[in-house]
Amino acid sequence: MQIDPSHYQIAVEQAQAVAAAARSCRCRRRGRRADLDALVVSKENRENAAHSASSADAQYQQAIAALDARSSTLERSRVVAPVDGYITNLQTFKGNYAVAGQAKLAIVDSHSFWVYGYFEETKLPRVKIGAPAEMRLMSGGVMKGHVESISRGIYDRDNPQSRDLVRT
C-alpha cells in the first residue's frame, strides 16, 4: 500500500536544502575561526568566532536530524506486509485517509494457516494430536494439515448454551 509520497518527498528536499545551507555556514564559520587563530586579534573576537562556529555546528546537527526525520517519514509512506499472505477484512478505498492506530486490513500469513474446528464429542474418536487432517473448502479445494491440539469446553458463539464457557 502506498500513501501519496509527494508531500513527504518535498519535505525531504526542503530538509536537504536546509542541511546544505547549514553545512556551508558551518564551513564558513569554522574557516573564519581558523583564520582568526592565525592572526593577532583580541580574545573577544576569537571567542566570538569560536561561539559562532559552535552555533553553526549545532545548527548543522539540527538540520541533519530534521532531514533524518523527514526521510524516515517518507519511507513510512510505503506500507509493506511483514509476511507473504492474503489480505482480508479490507476496509479502505482509494481516497480514504490512514489514521495511526486504526486497522484498515488484516493479513493472513500464507505459510501459517490455523483452523479452529468445533466437533461434538461423539464425533471425535479418530481425532488425535498429530493425526493428519483434511479440510474440504466450499470452493472445492482441499487443504491438508494435522491436529495440533485438542481442547474441551470451548466457547461457541453460535450456541447460546455455551455463553459461560471459556472463550479462545
Curated annotation (Swiss-Prot):
Domain of life (superkingdom): Bacteria
Offer one Pfam family short name for this entry. HlyD_D23
SUPFAM superfamilies xrefs: HlyD-like secretion proteins
Q: Outline what the protein does.
A: Involved in the resistance (detoxification) of the fungal toxin fusaric acid.
Q: What is this protein called?
A: Fusaric acid resistance protein FusE
